[in-house]
């Protein structure tokens, strides 16, 4: 099944390029972003776009474009967009953790830091819809290597190091970027926080490397213990954000909904949860609608690709040799769980089931 999954991932990456970038040129979204950038304006503000961040002109231009794109998400001009972005942000944690855990096979701590920093920056800069599918298509879905190595490179880390690095390097910058401006912070400061948040994959990779060096003389932990805390944390973030999105969206349909007066049409499940099909494209007239459409496809494709890849990992490890009945039975259960708890939550659970099984085999083999 691996060849089929790899082909599907490549197709999904191509679809992401088409829906996110090609159609964004066709429907006027890229032109709208460029116009706002050249005019120095932000969604909901006529001016105030910050131009200087680092002193490096290419990097400053990139961060300026990031602020134009992300401003309506963090500024809250569209409740539906901000709500969907929260669910997307929650799903990024299990996606990143899956990449990190799989990179740990036969890798030194330097390789782990460099690979995840580079991969994470590509995911943040281009989008997980394209990069996650490409990265996963390049990775082997076999767990045999885990049963041999037992992930020695990162076993020196403490069990709370990974969750703490996620909180400090990813969630904290997100929270600071979400502070209301100008009520709590100034508009330039909010833009600076948004710019700082763009580097979260690099910060996490560096935090892992620093934690490893500080614990160089510590007793090694069991790999299951190390990743169990990170797994539980990532799963909780993903489930809470997804269930929150579903709850508010479906509550908006009720006549007694507290969200009825708050853009209830935008919060309707049909508008908020289902991306507009490519042949239903319309001209983008507002930045908020363009960003939401962009995130729709980015989230849908990246989460689908991650789920399919983890499904293949789990099937190879736990279900090899089963027939079509087992395949369709498992697929139907996973589809239901994905709708209820989020596809990235289910993907992480599948991956952890296969990983923990092989780590336990590795530990038992070393004890003999």
From Swiss-Prot:
According to UniProt, the name of this protein is Terpene cyclase ptmA
Top EC group = isomerase
Keywords, ordered alphabetically: Glycoprotein, Isomerase, Membrane, Transmembrane, Transmembrane helix
Q: Does the keyword Nucleotide-binding apply?
A: no
Q: What does the similarity note say? A: Belongs to the membrane-bound ascI terpene cyclase family.
Q: Where are the transmembrane segments?
A: 10-30, 81-101, 118-138, 192-212, 233-253, 334-354
Protein's job: Part of the gene cluster that mediates the biosynthesis of the indole diterpenes penitrems. The geranylgeranyl diphosphate (GGPP) synthase ptmG catalyzes the first step in penitrem biosynthesis via conversion of farnesyl pyrophosphate and isopentyl pyrophosphate into geranylgeranyl pyrophosphate (GGPP). Condensation of indole-3-glycerol phosphate with GGPP by the prenyl transferase ptmC then forms 3-geranylgeranylindole (3-GGI). Epoxidation by the FAD-dependent monooxygenase ptmM leads to a epoxidized-GGI that is substrate of the terpene cyclase ptmB for cyclization to yield paspaline.
